[in-house]
Amino acid sequence: MKHPLCTLLSLITFMCIGSKGLAEQLTNENLTTSFLPANFHKENTVTNDWIPEGEEDEDYLDLEKLLGEDDDYIYIIDAVSPTDSESSAGNILQLFQGKSRIQRLNILNAKFAFNLYRVLKDQATTSDNLFIAPVGISTAMGMISLGLRGETHEEVHSVLHFRDFVNASSKYEVTTIHNLFRKLTHRLFRRNFGYTLRSVNGLYIQKQFPIREDFKAAMREFYFAEAQEANFPDPAFISKANNHILKLTKGLIKEALENIDPATQMLILNCIYFKGTWVNKFPVEMTHNHNFRLNEREVVKVSMMQTKGNFLAANDQELDCDILQLEYVGGISMLIVVPRKLSGMKTLEAQLTPQVVERWQKSMTNRTREVLLPKFKLEKNYNLVEVLKSMGITKLFNKNGNMSGISDQRIAIDLFKHQSTITVNEEGTQAAAVTTVGFMPLSTQVRFTVDRPFLFLVYEHRTSCLLFMGKVTNPAKS
């Protein structure tokens, strides 16, 4: 959509998730020598710039303070403001009881993600796989909301449930949200817990375009996004940006930027890359061809991984589904949700809420299980403009939107691109291929077989952050 009286702004997010070993060396475009994960703490994983020892900037040196004082800030438990609606059954504020500030924000981020997922699902066909990275989308919306005013700001805060967060406690205000996103970035992306989780936020501004200095300062303070000059009509800019994203995502996302409208004046970029190691690995020699039921009539052969170990699992009688938790090293896990009936996916998708996930997690039991899970790789590319419009965010995407906190000139967003890739396979470490796993007789253990369409949710547990979610309808398709 063109806005002749407006300049254009684009929001672009890129997400990658894999399950390969952590021994692979990391490289940086500004460095000729590769470095090992043992030195991971020396890299600023927000800006992707190498920081030589003894030359850390002030913001990075503040990390030690963040590990103490700031943890108290984000993990403090505040009283919930009483409201008439809170007493209603199933109200999400009931989940806030006993939860920290960062967990409360992430509960509402998940609520937004589930609503957005449902809109994407309605726009897709029943045979489509789906995959999104909620933390990236919420972060991008948080960044842009810094510059929104009036009704435009209210729309975003309502749909993202930021307003619900602020209203939950007399101690919360709008700035609290941005402070928590800042602390979440430190918690998730600047600490090495045994997995690789990296993020880059970028703010690209066309040369000579007037951006408010307080907006640029707030972007840096809360989201670590440094303003950089760009020449969007120049193909060299696209090439350079694509190379940067290619390296960040270890080659998983190629040609991320294809065409940028020459009228674009500002681009906000959010990239996330995750690589985790299974706690219970899938030996490669156990992978075999197995039937996967697409629907009542169609079956495809897929590469089915197999392992045995202690796993948390639950069954939901109300939604008629089974849930399995697959743990990554370091406090991240993937929930696999499988409807017992092929026709049960619609009900499951319609009723998925943070309250339901909480119920699953509280009802899980730990025992020895044999697990069969298909390998899969999903590559998805969405323009979320129409999706967000249908959810109630309209002024952000038309010429009447109030973004006066960004620039004195009128701006309209014409693109909100969300591109994501996930690879799930046997590899957890280099030794995974030669790991020997003994299997007990089936009569003495429980088998969890994922041989029909399923949902998956990837959570970081300490912050209750929903990193990724999706649906695998056909593992043989991307």
UniProtKB/Swiss-Prot annotation:
Q: Which organism is it from?
A: Mus musculus
Site: Reactive bond. Where? 442-443
Gene3D superfamilies recorded for this chain? Alpha-1-antitrypsin, domain 1 (2.30.39.10), Antithrombin, subunit I, domain 2 (3.30.497.10)
Annotated region described as 2 X 11 AA approximate repeats, Asp/Glu-rich (acidic) (hirudin-like), given as residue ranges:
54-78
Q: Which residues carry this modification: Sulfotyrosine?
A: 60, 73
The entry's function note states:
Thrombin inhibitor activated by the glycosaminoglycans, heparin or dermatan sulfate. In the presence of the latter, HC-II becomes the predominant thrombin inhibitor in place of antithrombin III (AT). Also inhibits chymotrypsin, but in a glycosaminoglycan-independent manner.
User: For the region Glycosaminoglycan-binding site, what residue ranges are annotated?
Assistant: 171-191
State the domain notes: The N-terminal acidic repeat region mediates, in part, the glycosaminoglycan-accelerated thrombin inhibition.
Q: Per the record, what is one GO cellular component?
A: extracellular space
Q: Spell out the protein name for this chain.
A: Heparin cofactor 2
Tissues where the protein occurs: Expressed predominantly in liver.
Return the CDD domains for the record: serpinD1_HCF2
Repeat positions for sequence? 54-64, 68-78
Record keywords, A-Z: Blood coagulation, Glycoprotein, Hemostasis, Heparin-binding, Protease inhibitor, Repeat, Serine protease inhibitor, Signal, Sulfation
Biological process according to GO: blood coagulation
GO molecular function per UniProt: heparin binding; serine-type endopeptidase inhibitor activity
Task: State whether keyword Ribonucleoprotein applies.
Answer: no
Which residues does UniProt assign to the signal peptide?
A: 1-23
- Designated gene of the protein: Serpind1
